[in-house]
């Protein structure tokens, strides 16, 4: 199973995502609550998958996604955001995200996207 970095500014959402991942046998190796921290933690941990919110303080998730992809073009990033507008989904995919999960979500949808991102 995969080593995962979970990034969201809401502690509750980090727990929801972490619990869903753990229930499927994945290991949450780190968490971050800002886009800036996400980039630093990615460099430090080199996870197999990163889940990333868009709306966060200091640096938004799309900026963090672009920076992570510049560091590691093979990075596997899954966007988990309440901003489900088509334009945000398209921008995320163009920047390199493997999939986009709209919050609120069912654990099954998250795990389906995780499987797709890791395939």
Stretch-by-stretch model annotation:
Residues 56:
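Receiver (REC) domain active-site loop signature in two-component systems and cognate sites
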Residues 83-84:
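Short, conserved "switch-loop" micro-motifs in signal-transduction and mechanochemical regulators
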């Amino acid at each position: 199973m995969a080593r995962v970095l979970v990034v969201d500014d809401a502690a509750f959402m980090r727990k929801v995502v972490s619990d869903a991942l753990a229930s499927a046998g994945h290991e949450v190796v780190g968490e971050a609550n800002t886009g800036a921290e996400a980039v630093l933690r990615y460099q430090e941990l080199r996870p197999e998958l990163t889940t990333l919110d868009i709306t966060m303080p200091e640096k938004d998730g799309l900026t963090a996604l672009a920076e992570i992809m510049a560091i590691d073009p093979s990075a596997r990033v899954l966007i988990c955001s309440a901003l489900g507008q088509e334009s945000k989904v398209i921008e995320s995919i163009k920047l390199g995200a493997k999939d986009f999960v709209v919050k609120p979500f069912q654990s099954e949808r998250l795990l389906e996207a995780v499987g797709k991102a890791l395939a």
